[in-house]
């Protein structure tokens, strides 16, 4: 299946929920929405798997790295400890702007 081949997630193609659980998000979105750093995505073991696609909006820009949202959310909980801690950190960042 697509998810097994690219993200090592045992889910058949007909069971895939591309709109929510198995949605793909960009690296930028993962960093902004879940307050993750490059090292959280790429260096922290196990490094998150991703696919590379051409940027559909700006063909001159670099390729996009797309991560599986399910795995990004799980990593964010590892980094921040809980959903509440993540929300608190977002609020602090918003106040500091």
Curated annotation (Swiss-Prot):
Interacts with GPN1. Interacts with RPA1 and RPA2; the interaction is direct and associates XPA with the RPA complex. Interacts (via N-terminus) with CEP164 upon UV irradiation. Interacts with HERC2. It is found in: Nucleus. Involved in DNA excision repair. Initiates repair by binding to damaged sites with various affinities, depending on the photoproduct and the transcriptional state of the region. Required for UV-induced CHEK1 phosphorylation and the recruitment of CEP164 to cyclobutane pyrimidine dimmers (CPD), sites of DNA damage after UV irradiation. The lineage of its organism: Eukaryota, Metazoa, Chordata, Craniata, Vertebrata. PROSITE patterns: XPA_2. The modification Phosphoserine is found at residue 82. Its main location: nucleus. One of its GO terms (biological process) is UV-damage excision repair. Belongs to the XPA family. Zn(2+) binds at residues 12, 15. It comes from Cricetulus griseus (Chinese hamster). The keyword Zinc applies. CDD domains: DBD_XPA. There is a cross-link at residue 31 (Glycyl lysine isopeptide (Lys-Gly) (interchain with G-Cter in SUMO2)). Keywords: DNA damage, DNA repair, DNA-binding, Isopeptide bond, Metal-binding, Nucleus, Phosphoprotein, Ubl conjugation, Zinc, Zinc-finger. Ubiquitinated by HERC2 leading to degradation by the proteasome. It holds the Pfam family XPA_C. The gene is XPA. A zinc finger (unnamed) spans 1-15. It comes from the Eukaryota. Disulfide bonds: none annotated. This is DNA repair protein complementing XP-A cells homolog.
């Amino acid at each position: 299946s697509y998810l097994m081949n690219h993200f090592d997630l045992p889910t058949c193609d007909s069971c895939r929920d591309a709109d929510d659980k198995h949605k793909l998000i960009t690296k930028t979105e993962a960093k902004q929405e879940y307050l993750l750093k490059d090292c959280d995505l790429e260096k922290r073991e196990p490094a998150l798997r991703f696919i590379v696609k051409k940027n559909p909006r700006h063909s001159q820009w670099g390729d996009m790295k797309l991560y599986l949202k399910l795995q990004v959310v799980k990593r964010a909980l590892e980094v921040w400890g809980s959903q509440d801690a993540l929300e608190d950190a977002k609020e602090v960042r918003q106040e500091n702007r």
